[in-house]
Amino acid sequence: MAAFSEMGVMPEIAQAVEEMDWLLPTDIQAESIPLILGGGDVLMAAETGSGKTGAFSIPVIQIVYETLKDQQEGKKGKATIKTGASVLNKWQMNPYDRGSAFAIGSDGLCCQSREVKEWHGCRATRGLLRGKHYYEVSCHDQGLCRVGWSTMQASLDLGTDKFGFGFGGTGKKSHNKQFDNYGEEFTMHDTIGCYLDIDKGHVKFSKNGKDLGLAFEIPAHIKNQALFPACVLKNAELKFNFGEEEFKFPPKDGFVALSKAPDSYVVKSQHTGNAQVSQTKFLPNAPKALIVEPSRELAEQTLNNVKQFKKYIDNPKLRELLIIGGVAARDQLSVLDNGVDIVVGTPGRLDDLVSTGKLNLSQVRFLVLDEADGLLSQGYSDFINRMHNQIPQITSDGKRLQVIVCSATLHSFDVKKLSEKIMHFPTWVDLKGEDSVPDTVHHVVVPVNPKTDRLWERLGKNHIRTDDVHAKDNTRPGANSPEMWSEAIKILKGEYAVRAIKEHKMDQAIIFCRTKIDCDNLEQYFMQQGGGPDKKGHQFSCVCLHGDRKPHERKQNLERFKKGDVRFLICTDVAARGIDIHGVPYVINVTLPDEKQNYVHRIGRVGRAERMGLAISLVATEKEKVWYHVCSNRGKGCYNTRLKEDGGCTIWYNEMQLLSEIEEHLNCTISQVEPDIKVPVDEFDGKVTYGQKRAAGGGNYKGHVDILAPTVQELAALEKEAQTSFLHLGYLPNQLFRTF
């Protein structure tokens, strides 16, 4: 308790931590908790199981409590940033709602960006809820630009999400990343008119007074939201005219200038550079902290930690809510209506509730992105940016929004790019460094070569069911086609997985497959061997963990594996990411991951706490054709086996190339073993039993000690001489001069 209290953690939280047998903070907690309590943005990286969740949960809970306590007692914070509310008093481009390389002139109307590689955007200070309105934009040079309208939820990259409507100089209209031909190209000296008829739900544009016709019909999900003038530039300059000056091409058909819009139609921007007065009132659906997790299991795990840490906090009590898919939204909404302080959720359901206004982000004090590299790899960067844009940068008590990003590695380019975009001078806490394999992990590769191992020909139909990628191909023996070898690889991998389990008499292992259908097929094959979910204690008892399984089933399966009811957990990378599973002796990679960092994440699940672990990777020597769904339904009901470049949903997967990238990343050569999967024991390990601690006694260090012995003896003699000299100088002051 004292150790956490010394970092400034309040006694109530320290007491809860002590009851969890956390006597001392872990390294990541000791570094991060004081930084977060001090008000800074923090980027942290540490291994799974290092206490990373506690490192952000503890300070977040404490500051949320202190904020609520201050509100309860009527205290008001003092803003640390000069107010910018004056910009809302007229129609102009908003200096508090723009990209980092977007410049705005002193009049608020002339805008430019000289960035040649990236787009940078901006929105106006005001938007509209009703009426028929118009503004003009003049192009001052030949750079690239898009102009139009967007809601406050939209990305500043206009037209790349479902909340913005753009018209670009290349003659394309854009909405939700769909770029369609529209009107004409425009460039320097052209004037573009932007029309908005909210009552009819129409958006259109004109060029030099020529009406280009209807561009967009406003979809239902944003009909009740204010639309703001917006633009995005790449090495371009524009000048806006909202009606304060005479229009070059005055609008017709009842459209009026934005500057003439009645006050009842106008909505001011949330981005003012300071907290809004309206945010100070209590809103039940406006949490103080938002924690985003990439999977349901991680979200549940984090929520449980929050509940444990805050159990002794009272007056006011903290209210938390889990927002994940697969659960009735009705239940979550009823909790929101009663008030919530901390929300933990996954992107899909969070996006639904935020976009419909059911979850209000106006009072968020903390934004935590856990496993940020996982969130980005799943394609949630637009969601993160859109959500961040909706959160005021200064809260109602005058404090700055704090952003905390946790990642398995901070060396990812995408994570670095995200941090530059949404964080304010973050402190990097990197206790992981470059990826490496712990010395308690023995990892080997088993080459799967269908040309030398012809077992697949002799199995007939008694093999694992494959993923139907080759359902329309000739894969019969003798075809000698890439498709035949690919199908043979899939069959052999099922056999090798069974062989590895039998050879090493595995009693517990995590088995990683590339796709959900691969997981299901391997589970079915284990059931053919007599195992499966309902065969407790059987050699092939197993459960599955992936996104298509129902939430309660996933939770139940994970618990059964942890308790030892079943021996094997068959899962995908996404489902298993960050899950707290300790002491597993074996990992089998049925397919290598397409991201080299994930290889380290996978095999790092064995060999913890000085226990030896074995990771076996089945690596195809030939290319394998696999699913790679780019369709809108993400693979559900998809049978398009054409290659991605031909408009299909498959790719050729080159595991030998992936293996070389992993070896280069780890700066080592991974040992290869024969298809019989007999793994030779490394000489420094002695006799190894995977899952048990390495034999103590220091035998591994004997040679090292022998080498250092002479140096240590010399150091001891020097220490003795120094101590003797000190005693003579301190207590026998005349001794020094007796020799003279």
UniProtKB/Swiss-Prot annotation:
GO terms for cellular component: cleavage body; cytoplasm; cytoplasmic stress granule; cytosol; mitochondrion; nucleus; ribonucleoprotein complex; tRNA-splicing ligase complex. Phosphorylated by ATM kinase; phosphorylation is increased in response to ionizing radiation (IR). InterPro entries: B30.2/SPRY, B30.2/SPRY_sf, ConA-like_dom_sf, DEAD/DEAH_box_helicase_dom, Helicase_ATP-bd, Helicase_C-like, P-loop_NTPase, RNA_helicase_DEAD_Q_motif. CDD domains: DEADc_DDX1, SF2_C_DEAD, SPRY_DDX1. GO terms for molecular function: ATP binding; ATP hydrolysis activity; chromatin binding; DNA binding; DNA/RNA helicase activity; double-stranded RNA binding; exonuclease activity; nuclease activity. Residues 1-448 are annotated as: Interaction with dsRNA. ATP binds at residues 46-53. The helicase domain is involved in the stimulation of RELA transcriptional activity. Found in a multi-helicase-TICAM1 complex at least composed of DHX36, DDX1, DDX21 and TICAM1; this complex exists in resting cells with or without poly(I:C) RNA ligand stimulation. Interacts with DHX36. Interacts (via B30.2/SPRY domain) with DDX21 (via N-terminus); this interaction serves as bridges to TICAM1. Interacts with FAM98A (via N- and C-terminus). Interacts with PHF5A (via C-terminus). Interacts with MBNL1. Interacts with CSTF2. Interacts with HNRNPK. Interacts with ATM. Interacts with RELA (via C-terminus). Component of the tRNA-splicing ligase complex. Interacts with PQBP1. This is ATP-dependent RNA helicase DDX1. It comes from Rattus norvegicus. The gene is Ddx1.
